[in-house]
Each structure stands twice: as C-alpha cells, then as structure tokens.
Amino acid sequence: MAPKLLLHGCCAHCTAYSFKYWQEQGFAVSVYWYNPNIHPFMEHQSRLEAMRKLSAEMGFELITEPSYHMAEYFKNVSANVDGRCRICFDMRLGQTAAYAAGHGYEYFSSSLFISPHQKHQDAVCSAEALAKETGVRFAYADLRKRYSDSRHITKPLDLYRQQYCGCVYSEYERFGKPNSPA
C-alpha cells in the first residue's frame, strides 16, 4: 500500500505538477486547501474554485479547511510585516501538518515548493520544524525548475490565474505605485 501524503495546495497552478510529481514518486496524495493569507475574500473563493476544477480534472481528493481564519492571519502577520512570509508558512503548513497527523498521513508537503515567487528557504525551514513538532514526515523536492510544466498542465483547463501571491501586502508590492506609502 502506498504511503499517504497530504499536499498543501497554495493554488491550482502550482498544485498541478506538484500533485503529479508526488503521485509518480509512489505516494497516495490528497490535497489540502488552507490559505487564510489570500485576500480579498472573493480572490480566495476564485482560487478555491480553480482548485476544485483541477481536482475534478486530475482526480485527486481535495480537503478544504472550512474556516477562513482571516482575523488570525492578520493578527499574526501585522505584528511583524517584514517576517510575514515565514509566519504565513508556519500557519498554512502548520495546519496541514496537524491535519495530516490527525488523519493518518505519514507525510506532508506543499505546492509552495514549485513556485519561484516564494521565499523557498523560509518555507523549507517552516516545514522541517513542523515535521519535528508533529511527527509527520516532511516530503521535500525543489520543483522550481518544473514551474512551467505546471502551467502547461493547467493552461488548457482555462483555470482562474492569480496575479499575486495572495496577501494584500504582495498585491500592493505587485500593483502599488513605487513611491506611494504603504
């Protein structure tokens, strides 16, 4: 029987190749959606709907966290805006590892590790610490060189494609005026 891996899905585009990769490595993969960093709420819903479509297309089990946890996210990151990415990784991967521990998964990972736009090493450090804390093994692969492969999988599916990481800070960094105050 294949070992069970819970893959945190940050978005449909990054999840597509990540799911395929871990499945090819011999894991029974389920995808977990928990992303309280994505704002505004309708952006979160658009990305979740894209993930549901991808799940139907690729045939994976999609587990969604029923609570959005927006207030908790802002409470955690507002105290340390410069360190927000690590805090965000701790929240999302922490929830994933905890779910994995409570539901019989031997491993966890994330589609974050395919994105060239994430603070990769911070995400790795977060996942490694959470593996020690929860006892669930962290399955790691640096998939950043395969990012375009994921896009090739999802482009024909005409899924919603986001323009920023998800948080309002990244949205401002992407679209805000260069000299305007934050």
Swiss-Prot record:
It catalyses: epoxyqueuosine(34) in tRNA + AH2 = queuosine(34) in tRNA + A + H2O. GO terms for biological process: queuosine biosynthetic process; tRNA modification. GO terms for molecular function: 4 iron, 4 sulfur cluster binding; epoxyqueuosine reductase activity; metal ion binding. [4Fe-4S] cluster binds at residues 10-11, 85, 88. It comes from the Bacteria. Catalyzes the conversion of epoxyqueuosine (oQ) to queuosine (Q), which is a hypermodified base found in the wobble positions of tRNA(Asp), tRNA(Asn), tRNA(His) and tRNA(Tyr). Belongs to the QueH family. PANTHER family: EPOXYQUEUOSINE REDUCTASE QUEH. HAMAP family: QueH (MF_02089). This is Epoxyqueuosine reductase QueH. It comes from Dehalococcoides mccartyi (strain ATCC BAA-2266 / KCTC 15142 / 195) (Dehalococcoides ethenogenes (strain 195)). The gene is queH.
